[in-house]
Curated annotation (Swiss-Prot):
Keywords on record: FAD, Flavoprotein, Metal-binding, Oxidoreductase, Zinc
Regulation: Activated by Zn(2+) ions at low concentrations (10 uM) and inhibited by Zn(2+), Fe(2+) and Ni(2+) at high concentrations (10 mM).
Phenotype of gene-disrupted mutants: The deletion mutant is barely able to use D-2-HG for growth and displays a relatively slower growth in a medium containing glucose. Cells lacking this gene also show high accumulation of extracellular and intracellular D-2-HG. Moreover, the mutant strain loses the ability to utilize D-malate for growth.
Protein known as: D-2-hydroxyglutarate dehydrogenase
Length: 464
């Protein structure tokens, strides 16, 4: 869509200066963190109200113009990429927390509220927003809802879906729907709210969301444990889960740790070299809980599941231990990683990881593989690092070949090709490995109801 007359008409729907067509803006707002697709939007529009969003959607319907939602653009599946002349709808100016309800522990947010902004707001109120991940400083609530974002606390607090009390959406027809009205109990038929969570903007745009908040955790304490092999991580998880209510249980490989330590600004947890590491967190609200954690650690050492470990003794040490895990994605970005975000049920994780690791190692022995993830909920992040001497297109082509084998294994284990990053365009052609043909047809039928003209983020989840 490059018709200047249509762009001029679009400009009348928003405030002056809130439609951009310069090359820098098109490049910046037409992409997310994926590097697989060249951005090529026609324009970027910045609404400041629900009414303006409705007007934009109705304009797009009238002229059959495709729209792509844009939040913090931190996604890893190209769900926010505009590569085919679409108009990008950025929610940067709809960024306010509109209301706080102390009794209900809820905050009413516009879609452009940054995740860390909501976290800080909750903290200022003596509360806690628990959905957390490395991109919290720039990701936006609308995007979190669009991908049903997970992160590092899912084992205790669940996904974004669990924290949406209600929301307002503008459908692909331009209708405004208020979903669930912030109720805890609402047994009145279909919960349409759940359809829009994880829909990646393909049904409509979230324009307001009421987010639930939680009590603040107290005296959070972390342990980093080194294990002799991956199989040992699972009994460690079970041992600690039997004794403590964990708030997190993460894992990473020795190669992941080496990359982070290579930065020079993060201390090693201990001197012993181990092939795999687990990071777990719990609330040490009493001295007995801390003692129980130490006793469980000693038990794991006696069983041969743990070679070495350390437990945080201060807030600073807690932060340093978390940096070992949280800095991985940022650190390996230098190597243009090809990322897979896959999941199986927790009990299948060891056999699944071994099989995937063997597949990649057999076919591409020269590729460096970095594993990490949220082992407590069965979510593994497989990262294949690009050799410095290899062209990016050649590298991505080889990785795409690996994908088929990886996803066939995911299907074999009844897993998901996308645990928390969404489908977007990067996983679109592999959806059949996680969803049956009947499911996909019903999903397309749902989209047709809310977006009959196919203007809402077309080409994401399934082909346009």
């Amino acid at each position: 869509m490059t018709d200047p007359a249509l762009i001029d008409e679009l400009k009348t729907l928003v405030e002056p200066g809130k439609v951009l067509t310069d090359a820098d803006s098109l490049n910046a707002y037409g992409k997310d963190w994926t590097k697989h697709f060249a951005p090529a939007p026609s324009a970027i529009v910045f609404p400041k109200s629900i009414e303006q969003v409705q007007a934009i959607v109705r304009w797009a319907n009238a002229h059959k113009v495709a729209l792509v939602p844009s939040g913090g653009r931190t996604g890893l599946s190209a769900a926010a990429v505009a590569a085919n002349g679409e108009v990008v709808v950025s929610f940067d100016y709809m960024n306010q927390i509109l209301e706080f309800n102390e009794m209900d522990r809820t905050a009413v947010c516009q879609p452009g509220v940054v995740t860390a902004q909501l976290q800080q707001f909750a903290e200022d109120k003596g509360l806690y927003y628990p959905v957390d991940f490395a991109s919290a400083g720039s990701s936006q609530i609308g995007g979190n809802i669009g991908t049903n974002a997970g992160g590092i606390k899912v084992i205790r607090y669940g996904m974004t879906r669990n924290w949406v009390a209600g929301m307002k959406v503008v459908t692909g027809k331009g209708d405004l729907l208020e979903l669930n009205k912030d109720l805890i109990k609402n047994a009145t038929g279909y919960d349409l709210r759940q359809l829009f969570i994880g829909a990646e903007g393909t049904l409509g745009f979230v324009v307001e969301a009421t987010m639930r908040l939680e009590r603040q955790p107290t005296n959070l304490t972390a342990l980093v444990l080194g294990t002799p092999d991956f199989d040992s991580i699972m009994p460690v998880l079970h041992a600690f889960q039997d004794k403590l209510d964990l708030t997190a249980f993460e894992f990473f490989s020795d190669k992941a740790l080496a990359k982070v330590l290579g930065r020079g600004d993060v201390p090693a947890p201990f001197e012993t070299d181990c092939p795999f590491y687990a990071l777990l967190e719990f609330e040490a609200t009493t001295e007995e809980r801390a003692e129980q954690a130490l006793a469980t650690f000693e038990h794991c050492v006696e069983q041969g599941w743990v070679l070495d470990g350390v437990m945080s003794q201060s807030e600073q040490q807690l932060q340093n231990l978390w940096k070992l895990r949280e800095y991985i994605s940022e650190t390996i970005s230098h190597w243009t990683p090809y990322k897979n975000d896959i999941s199986v049920t927790v009990g299948k994780v060891p056999a699944f990881l071994k099989e995937i690791d063997a597949i990649v190692g057999e076919h591409y022995p020269d590729f460096e593989i970095v594993w990490f993830g949220h082992i407590g909920d069965g979510n593994l992040h497989l990262n294949i690092l690009k050799p410095d001497a290899m062209d990016k297109d050649e590298f991505f082509g080889k990785c795409a070949t690996v994908n088929k084998w990886v996803f066939e294994t995911v299907q074999k284990y009844n897993g998901s090709i996308s645990a928390e990053h969404g489908v977007g365009m990067t996983k679109r052609d592999y959806l059949e490995y996680s969803r049956s043909p009947a499911e996909i047809e019903y999903m397309k039928a749902v989209k047709a109801v809310f977006d009959p003209n196919g203007i809402m983020n077309p080409g994401k989840i399934f082909a346009a």
